[in-house]
Regions:
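P-loop NTPase motor domains
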Residues: 1-224, 290-300
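RecA-like P-loop NTPase motor core of helicase/translocase proteins
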Residues: 7-12, 170, 204, 226, ...
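Intrinsically disordered, low-complexity acidic/polar segments
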Residues: 39, 164, 255, 305, ...
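Generic, ordered loop/turn and secondary-structure boundary motif
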Residues: 50, 54, 132, 212, ...
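Glycine-rich loops and low-complexity Gly/Arg-rich segments
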Residues: 55-59, 75-78, 178-182, 226-231, ...
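Repeat-unit-sized solenoid/scaffold elements
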Residues: 59-73, 96-100, 232-255, 273-280, ...
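Conserved ATP-driven motor cores of ASCE-family P-loop NTPases powering translocation/secretion/packaging/pilus
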Residues: 226-308
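Conserved P-loop NTPase motor module
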Residues: 291-343
């Protein structure tokens, strides 16, 4: 989405399409977890994201329990490490020699087998280059700086594309952004000054059921945001191919839904939760063109309506104001003339 993406052509072959940065220029910033991959692909990133170990909370690890195959007792043991070492808990744990785990567990009053399992599973995090002991610049403060300027941000993962990486980073960054938004919102509500009002923020997540299934929704920051219903000026745009896996309470909070063709009965039922005329809409959903139509319903429209999606091609680029080649040169010349006059 940031710089360039692949897209299937009508013949089934894959071609390249422009990303948001190419179309909207300075209105979009690309933050990357993998600057080397970005450079190899010619991506013009704006910031390389590094996350210090002391920003990883136990809650972030708890949300990864399924991906890490972590037992609940191992997660609970994390709090015993936090009680002794505070924010340095993860760094201290990862630096333990496996031979010393029993002594370490005795020091904090934990079961050796639980600490051993926790240590073994969390060692996987060391393969992520963006996790470091110390960082020069705080990625979340940088994100907030861009947001305050009204600049949209695409977080690019590069070759760090595992679900474990995606869920870890999404949880950490979103949790901290939400914390800052709560502070900004409370300051605005207390003083009532227009200049303190936070910019409305929409956070987009793919594979949303990973964060918002019944178990994860109680543990991740995304469940909190969904239940708050924009209370702190933060909303979620959730994208998923398996809506039936998303917690029912969360689905009931989704105000506007854009739904393409669905064939699974459970997914159809989930999307139509709380919607009037569900039986009629069920037949509409089942008859949509798989690539060109979507059903739009909810707060954004007075009644459900089927829309035809636009092709993402050169015609669309032009409609968005994108120009290149000779036309770009002419536009640049015209802008210079407007600024300095013809010479």
């Amino acid at each position: 989405y940031g710089w360039q993406a692949t897209q299937e052509s009508g013949s089934g072959r894959r071609g390249f399409v422009k990303g948001l940065k190419q179309l909207f220029g300075s209105k979009v910033a690309i933050f990357t977890l993998d600057p080397e991959s970005a450079r190899r692909r010619g991506v013009q990133s704006d910031f390389a994201v590094k996350i210090p170990y002391n920003q990883v909370m136990v809650e972030d690890i708890a949300a990864l329990a399924d991906e890490l195959n972590l037992h609940a007792t191992a997660v609970e043991s994390s709090y015993l490490i936090v009680n002794k070492y505070g924010r340095d808990w993860l760094s201290v744990l990862l630096h333990q020699d496996p031979k010393d785990i029993k002594d370490f567990a005795d020091q904090i009053g934990a079961h050796p087998e639980s600490i051993s399992a926790l240590h073994r599973k969390l060692k996987r995090l060391e393969k992520f280059d963006f996790l470091q002991e110390k960082v020069i610049e705080d990625a979340v403060f940088k994100i907030m700086e861009f947001i305050d300027k009204g600049i949209h941000i695409v977080l690019e993962f590069g070759q760090q594309s595992s679900f474990l990486c995606y869920m870890l980073v999404a949880n950490i960054l979103t949790r901290r952004i939400h914390d800052l938004y709560v502070m900004k919102s409370e300051r605005y509500l207390a003083a009532g000054r227009t200049q303190d009002k936070p910019k409305q923020l929409i956070i987009t997540i793919e594979e949303a059921h990973k964060f918002l299934n019944p178990m994860a929704a109680r543990q991740t920051i995304f469940g909190t945001i969904a239940r708050e219903m924009r209370k702190y000026f933060v909303s979620l745009l959730i994208i998923d191919q398996r809506p039936s896996s998303i917690d029912d309470e969360i689905m009931s909070q989704v105000g506007t839904r854009i739904t393409s063709l669905l064939s699974d009965e459970k997914d159809i039922a989930a999307v139509l939760t709380g919607v009037s005329n569900a039986s009629w809409l069920r037949s509409v959903l089942a008859s949509l063109d798989s690539k060109q139509q979507a059903l739009l319903m909810g707060h954004a429209v007075p009644m459900p309506v089927v829309i035809r999606t636009r092709d993402y091609d050169g015609v669309f680029y032009t409609a968005m104001g994108h120009v290149e080649g000779e036309e770009l040169a002419q536009k640049a010349h015209a802008n210079i003339a407007d600024l300095f006059g013809d010479r």
